[in-house]
Amino acid sequence: MMPNRLEPELDIYQYPEHLRACLAPLPKGPGVYVFHGQSESLPLYIGKSVNVRSRVMAHFRAQGEAKMLRQTRHISFIETAGELGALLLEAQLIKQQQPLFNKRLRRSKQLCALRLQADTVTIAYAKEIDFAVTPHLYGLFANRHAALEKLRAIADEHRLCYGKLGIDKLPAGRACFRYSLRKCAGACCGVEPTQEHARRLGAALEQLRIACWPYAGRVALEEQGEALRQYHVIHNWFYLGSVSSLAQAQRLQSAASHFDSDGYKILCKPLIAGDYRIIELP
């Protein structure tokens, strides 16, 4: 069957005839959209946009997506109040439904961070402590190797001692090898005071600090769009869901089951910056 055009002004977009009815109602506002194949329980692709219609149309001019489009039977969408709600819902749905053509978003069993206590750095794992409420954690890493690679990079940039950081073993009574190369400031041999090394380490890590959850419990984050207002319910950086009223938000009592690194990355900056109205929930 020959492809058809949806609208004259959008003649660059081509689409299979059977998708005409799905494309017509797509909104020009923010939301999440889903490409469905034959299976109703396993979507092909889940995406989000501040303009759902425009983004979905763009899929039809991407040559690399021809395989997915051939399998698409219909397209659904969920409108949101704004971009933040779309980001949160997309991440939640991808993890829940694992669409075939999305990059997998799974809870990492090895999710870890650098933990600074006094002048000692260790690797802390999210499966062992709650990152949402534990202070002095820095960076979010998929595994121990990634965390140590970042620590090495920080040490190299700031002339910190591998031995003091636990990356290498220190030779008894001698300076580390990197000190002879002028890549270490000498905390290993007394040239740099231990307190100064600890201060510089803390300063170097600061940009990676994981913010502790700043509220006593659940909150509702209000997002107002042109035609829709939503309350996104969050607890310990974990997205519990979105509702249309505070009464519904108070009834949304699901507990955060684990530290959600995706939720943290989406929410931390706008929440701490005060970009949205926050209502603490009982």
Summary of predicted features, one role per range:
Residues 2-44, 48-282:
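Conserved catalytic/ligand-binding micro-motifs in nucleotide and anionic cofactor chemistry
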